[in-house]
């Protein structure tokens, strides 16, 4: 009985930790800085010349899937972790999913992240996301946004960088709200609007209209 009780306690503690991680990120979800300035810079790149990719490129060449999408029960008041986590050593290269442009990025967080660390928002990304890249890409004539979080410092490509599928866009780190080295990845299906059209109308929402926390489960994308 004692073993069963200890196991249940450990599982509850893990769920509470996971919920807190999701809530922290949800508190800061809007790009910082001048959105109009960003749009002007993106427009000058001529994104309509980017050719659509024929499929998704794997984000890493090594590592393991350490977490998928979690949904927490009422015993911890709900909560959600959207996307997936790939655990690998610090410095492992992260590759672009497809041809596109870095719509937003954040750098300047150290690689000594911990649970509750809010670094990322002041650097231009989401709170707790550490060093991060938001890639706007076209794959099979469909536009997607791909979010990569918790990168090593000085590795994220800068906003406005045009990339090809498979180009390195950063490296795995331990920045922001984490307990170990990994990259958190989310994919948002945005429709058939061109890259340039989407970028010019983007509101700065780093959840791309899908919502954050439990609200993210109420949208299909």
Locate each region found by the language model.
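Domain-scale macromolecular recognition modules
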Residues: 52-101, 105
């Amino acid at each position: 009985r004692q073993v069963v009780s200890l196991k249940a306690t450990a599982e509850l503690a893990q769920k509470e930790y996971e919920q807190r991680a999701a809530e922290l990120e949800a508190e800061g979800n809007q790009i910082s800085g001048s959105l109009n300035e960003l749009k002007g810079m993106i427009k000058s790149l001529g994104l309509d010349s980017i050719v659509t990719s024929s499929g998704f490129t794997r984000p890493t060449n090594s590592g393991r899937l350490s977490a998928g999408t979690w949904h927490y029960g009422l015993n911890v008041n709900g909560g959600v972790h959207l996307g997936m986590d790939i655990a690998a050593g610090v410095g492992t290269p992260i590759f672009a999913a497809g041809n596109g442009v870095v719509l937003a990025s954040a750098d300047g967080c150290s690689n000594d992240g911990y649970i509750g660390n809010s670094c990322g928002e002041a650097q231009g990304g989401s709170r707790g996301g550490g060093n991060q890249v938001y890639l706007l890409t076209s794959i099979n004539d469909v536009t997607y946004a791909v979010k990569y979080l918790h990168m090593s410092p000085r590795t994220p490509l800068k906003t406005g960088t045009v990339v090809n599928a498979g180009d390195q866009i950063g490296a795995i780190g331990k920045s922001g709200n984490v307990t170990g080295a990994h990259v958190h990845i989310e994919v948002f299906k945005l429709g058939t609007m061109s890259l340039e059209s989407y970028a010019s109308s983007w509101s700065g929402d780093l959840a791309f209209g899908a919502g954050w926390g439990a609200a993210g489960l109420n949208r299909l994308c």
